[in-house]
């Protein structure tokens, strides 16, 4: 990559990283996708996601799976890590966390397709696994999003692996 392509990336390689413990959308950064002529998935797995229950203040733990088909922009991975870390002291329901993450990334990237799946560890004997997806309107990706939403969990895993 040229210096011009990475001039707006402020976090990658920064030795004085500031870890924000409160939700902060402005942490996210993107760079140009040099393969816009290809449809391809980029997938991130975050096995150490934490947030707080908005009622009890107790920590919630999850693995977050994020997959997307980029268009013009790709998310910079260190900024994504710090953005997800910023949920550490953020009090919100699991469903809201996953939907907010998805919408923030759609706003930043304008991807062709994006999905976020949160697999939260059980609390009180029940686990919650919210799923968000987006397909660009009036394209095949909108149809893909509808199909994947309807079929995303046909064969649910057992939860004894968490």
Curated annotation (Swiss-Prot):
Keyword Magnesium in annotation: no
The protein's Enzyme Commission number: 1.7.1.13
Cellular compartments annotated: Cytoplasm
Residues annotated to bind substrate: 75-77, 94-95
Short name of any one Pfam family annotated for the protein: QueF
Record-level GO cellular component terms: cytoplasm
Catalytic-site annotation from UniProt: 53 (thioimide intermediate), 60 (proton donor)
Reactions this protein catalyses: 7-aminomethyl-7-carbaguanine + 2 NADP(+) = 7-cyano-7-deazaguanine + 2 NADPH + 3 H(+)
Pathway(s) per entry: tRNA modification; tRNA-queuosine biosynthesis
Any GO BP annotation: tRNA modification
Key words, A-Z: Cytoplasm, NADP, Oxidoreductase, Queuosine biosynthesis
Highest rank taxon of the organism: Bacteria
Gene3D superfamilies membership: 3.30.1130.10
Record bears the keyword NADP: yes
Gene Ontology MF terms: preQ1 synthase activity
Principal place of residence: cytoplasm
Uppermost EC category: oxidoreductase
Function: Catalyzes the NADPH-dependent reduction of 7-cyano-7-deazaguanine (preQ0) to 7-aminomethyl-7-deazaguanine (preQ1).
Family listed: Belongs to the GTP cyclohydrolase I family. QueF type 1 subfamily.
HAMAP family: QueF_type1
Protein name: NADPH-dependent 7-cyano-7-deazaguanine reductase
Organism: Streptococcus mutans serotype c (strain ATCC 700610 / UA159)
Name of encoding gene: queF
């Amino acid at each position: 990559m040229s210096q011009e392509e990475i001039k707006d990336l402020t976090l990658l390689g920064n030795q004085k990283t500031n870890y924000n413990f409160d939700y902060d959308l402005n942490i996210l950064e993107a760079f140009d996708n040099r393969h816009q002529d290809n449809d391809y998935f980029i997938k991130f797995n975050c096995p150490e996601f934490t947030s707080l229950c908005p009622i009890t203040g107790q920590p919630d733990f999850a693995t977050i799976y994020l997959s997307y088909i980029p268009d013009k922009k790709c998310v910079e991975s260190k900024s994504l890590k710090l953005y997800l870390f910023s949920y550490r002291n953020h009090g919100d329901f699991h469903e809201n966390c996953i939907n907010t993450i998805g919408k923030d990334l759609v706003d930043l990237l304008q991807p062709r397709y994006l999905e976020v799946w949160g697999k939260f560890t059980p609390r009180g004997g029940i686990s919650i696994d919210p799923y968000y997806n987006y397909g660009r309107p009036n394209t095949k990706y909108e149809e893909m999003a509808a199909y994947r939403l309807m079929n995303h969990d046909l064969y649910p895993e057992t939860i004894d692996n968490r």
